[in-house]
Amino acid sequence: MAIKERIGVVVSDKMDKTVVVAVSNRVPHKKYGKIVGQTRRYKAHDEENACHVGDRVRIRESRPLSRTKRWAVTDVLVAANRP
């Protein structure tokens, strides 16, 4: 099975070595066919604490690292503007 990858935005970086990444997806409604937006939040491992809120990142599936963490940050695509 191929390793899954997602691109999303960091919405929380308050945990040590962990970030919460929101991944948006547009899918058709099952019955009515209207295109609706879905957002899924993944906890991802950030070894160097390099990610901050607002960063656009790529995450990939990994082995379970904790009870809820099964993704890891591979790279920061666009860094957020920080003062």
Curated annotation (Swiss-Prot):
Superkingdom, natural source: Bacteria
Q: For this chain's UniProt record, which GO biological process terms are given?
A: translation
Please give the coiled-coil regions recorded for this protein: none
Q: Which UniProt keywords apply?
A: Ribonucleoprotein, Ribosomal protein, RNA-binding, rRNA-binding
- Any one GO molecular function term: rRNA binding
Q: What role does this protein play?
A: One of the primary rRNA binding proteins, it binds specifically to the 5'-end of 16S ribosomal RNA.
Its quaternary organisation is:
Part of the 30S ribosomal subunit.
- Enumerate the HAMAP family for this protein: Ribosomal_uS17_B (MF_01345_B)
Q: Which family does it belong to?
A: Belongs to the universal ribosomal protein uS17 family.
- Know the name of this protein? Small ribosomal subunit protein uS17
Protein source organism: Acaryochloris marina (strain MBIC 11017)
